[in-house]
């Protein structure tokens, strides 16, 4: 019926509606409203006397006026400029290196740790830009890309450093927001807090119209990598009811017999959950009784990471060596070990063509394992000689598939990769990852052989119960505690291997995961480049669920672990002892779940009671965590909870494998959480159902 246009020409002055809304002042522009009735045959002022139309027009004009007022009153961006000195800009390691701040606390100005700075070779930032002029050979003839830069940032913490010495003025934008540069120019060396104007994820910085007071002047900009931030404040857009439900489930599972859990969740650079449950062990070595004086698990407790070693030691080491240009993923294994070749009359061949990429993607043709520790030649050897014997045995191992023809998950691949690292660097594998990865990132609670690093048993979670083994006067006769559980790593590789042996806490893995999201760096420390990160996180040509070493979601291939809600760009791994890590690059999300699920009663095969709890099977917990970052209501969460109970009951009825105390106790834990949510109409209805009655009967029967 009508259209509202913003224009300057005068219109009827006696229009009743327009007398009160004739002019709106916004950003020094006088705007006048003209109402044109395009479809009405009589274009005159009498039309406004029709009350119903007048009211509609008045409402629209009022809404328009309020919108204009909102835009005109927009608060300028809150950008704090701080004067710094030459050393602060060119030696950022003094105050902003990851080496001096592993985790930032956004509620205070204090750093959490103040360790020694990293070696100078590691000091690097994600953006180190100098604005060139056309006469410079580095200037792009496309023009605009010279002054536009992409960087990763989060709303909680983003600092940008400037060397504007002898710069009198310049135009400066972050995304669509223009920032006043006058104070930056006045200071010479400055840093700005851009937390209020950056967005979570990729941002664009644009500078232009640089005015200099000397010909030699050049505007320089540096931006550190994002770091993880702790806060006591609630983060917007986080459904804390979902995180509370996870907390209730984990507490209930531990109360019903699950050994222990360490959980860390980080979203957009904020740590939104960091909890620990249970004790480091729950049986006495001599009496089989529970121990009330066993140390509680804390955020500092170390867990046997099992196959997460492959990611956070071996893959990191290979990525670092590729960054240093000491190796290529296309290097053949025979380059490092010339004796590595097909044996005569081999049924499966290709050793001479096998590359590092084949090892990373489990397409080498090696079997899953070979129990080298059981071979007499290995058992009779000691120390360094034992590892040399193992290497010879690996190089002689027969292939079960032609190289590159099939993917078979194999520990041998990563054992061999650790030998390659040692061959190339001249260091032991554990010392290399400590020197080149963990120390530069100030990670003090991740290592091989934790007892030798001075960690007491009270800070390490125990693993398998009832494993009878002893070596070098070590006491592991009742349960494994402080030593790697994996028999190959323990007996063949002196507890240091590329496939198992690493111990760490959730916080350390979260920092390493954030390093991957960041593109290879953390704070002011670069471990490898963004190009290498992208290459290693690309889909393997051999299997859609593999990148280079990393497991990936891709086409929901890993949803049992990561959850269906995870983006295709989600990566991570699991460990046999009960550990899981994931980082979702698209959603800037990190989830670390560390458990000692094997520290429970044996049920047969490779299974223990702890393996039958939801916590150990990951996907249910990760699904609820993902829902914390979507706008799901309470009844949705209640529905998830009832689904967990009904389908766990169905699994128990469907398979004898699930008819054990682990599964029963898990179901009991779920039902106890349901009782806490009995105020929900969905839960209330379920608790009155026939299914709930059958579940309670089953639990009563098996509690006797």
Predicted feature residues:
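Beta-strand-rich recognition domains
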Residues: 78-174, 196-240, 244, 249
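Active-site SXXK
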Residues: 244-250, 263, 269, 301-330, ...
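N-terminal amphipathic/hydrophobic targeting modules at extreme N-termini
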Residues: 6, 29-45, 51
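Short strand-turn-strand beta-turns centered on an Asx-Gly dipeptide
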Residues: 172-180, 268-269
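Short, conserved catalytic-motif segment at the N-terminal edge
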Residues: 236-303, 326, 343, 602-607, ...
């Amino acid at each position: 019926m009508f259209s509202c246009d913003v224009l300057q020409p005068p219109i009827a002055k006696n229009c009743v509606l327009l007398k009160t809304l004739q002019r709106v002042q916004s950003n020094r522009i006088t705007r006048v409203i003209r109402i044109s009735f395009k479809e009405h045959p009589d274009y005159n002022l009498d039309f406004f006397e029709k009350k119903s139309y007048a009211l509609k027009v008045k409402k629209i004009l009022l809404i328009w006026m309020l919108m204009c007022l909102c835009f005109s009153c927009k608060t300028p961006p809150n950008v704090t400029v701080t004067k710094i000195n030459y050393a602060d800009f060119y030696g950022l390691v003094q105050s902003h290196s990851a080496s001096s701040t592993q985790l930032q606390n956004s509620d205070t100005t204090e750093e959490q740790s103040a360790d020694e700075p990293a070696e100078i070779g590691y000091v690097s930032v994600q953006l180190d830009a100098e604005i060139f002029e056309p006469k410079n050979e580095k200037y792009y003839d496309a023009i605009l890309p010279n002054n536009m830069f992409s960087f990763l940032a989060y709303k909680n913490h983003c600092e940008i450093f400037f060397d504007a010495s002898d710069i009198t003025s310049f135009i400066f934008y972050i995304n669509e927001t223009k920032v006043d540069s006058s104070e930056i120019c006045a200071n010479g060396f400055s840093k700005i807090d851009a937390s209020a104007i950056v967005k979570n994820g990729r941002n664009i910085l644009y500078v232009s119209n640089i005015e200099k007071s000397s010909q030699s002047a050049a505007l320089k900009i540096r931006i550190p990598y994002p770091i993880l931030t702790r806060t006591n404040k609630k983060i917007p857009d986080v459904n804390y009811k979902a995180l509370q439900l996870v907390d209730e489930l984990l507490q209930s599972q531990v109360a019903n017999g699950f050994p222990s859990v360490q959980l860390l969740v980080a979203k957009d650079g904020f740590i939104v959950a960091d909890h620990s449950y249970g004790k480091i062990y729950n049986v006495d070595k001599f009496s089989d009784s529970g121990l009330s004086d066993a140390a509680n698990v804390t955020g500092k407790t170390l867990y046997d990471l099992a196959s997460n070693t492959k990611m956070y030691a071996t893959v990191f080491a290979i990525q670092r060596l590729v960054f240093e240009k000491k190796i290529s993923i296309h290097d053949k294994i025979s380059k490092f070990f010339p004796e590595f070749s097909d044996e005569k009359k081999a049924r499966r061949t290709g050793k001479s063509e096998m590359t590092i990429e084949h090892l990373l993607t489990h397409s080498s043709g090696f079997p899953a394992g070979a129990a080298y520790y059981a071979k007499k030649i290995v058992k009779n050897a000691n120390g360094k000689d034992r590892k040399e014997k193992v290497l010879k045995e690996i190089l002689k191992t027969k292939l079960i598939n032609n190289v590159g023809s099939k993917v078979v998950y194999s520990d041998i691949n990563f054992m061999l990769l650790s030998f390659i690292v040692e061959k190339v660097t001249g260091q032991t594998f554990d010392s290399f990852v400590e020197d080149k990865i963990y120390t530069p990132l100030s990670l003090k609670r991740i290592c091989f052989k934790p007892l030798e690093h001075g960690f007491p048993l009270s800070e390490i979670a125990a693993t398998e119960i009832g494993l009878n083994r002893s070596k070098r006067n070590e006491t592991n006769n009742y349960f494994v505690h402080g030593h790697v559980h994996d028999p190959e790593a323990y007996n063949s590789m002196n507890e240091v291997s590329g496939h198992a042996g690493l111990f760490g806490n959730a916080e350390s893995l979260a920092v390493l995961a954030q390093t991957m999201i960041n593109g290879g760096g953390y704070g002011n420390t670069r471990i490898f480049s963004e190009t290498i990160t992208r290459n290693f996180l690309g889909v393997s040509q051999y299997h859609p669920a593999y990148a280079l070493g990393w497991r990936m979601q891709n086409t929901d291939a890993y949803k049992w672990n990561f959850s269906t809600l995870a983006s295709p760009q989600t990566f991570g791994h699991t460990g046999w002892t009960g550990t899981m890590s994931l980082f979702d690059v698209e959603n800037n999300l990190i989830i670390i779940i560390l458990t000692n699920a094997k520290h429970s009663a044996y049920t047969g095969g490779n299974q223990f009671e702890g393996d039958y709890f939801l916590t150990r099977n990951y996907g249910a917990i990760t699904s609820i965590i993902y829902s914390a970052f979507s706008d799901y209501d309470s009844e949705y969460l209640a529905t998830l909870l009832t689904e967990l109970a009904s389908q766990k009951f169905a699994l128990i009825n469907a398979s004898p494998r699930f008819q054990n105390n682990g599964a029963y106790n898990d179901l009991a834990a779920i039902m106890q959480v349901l009782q806490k949510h009995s105020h929900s109409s969905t839960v209330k209805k379920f608790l009155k159902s026939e299914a709930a009655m059958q579940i309670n009967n089953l639990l009563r029967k098996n509690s006797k």
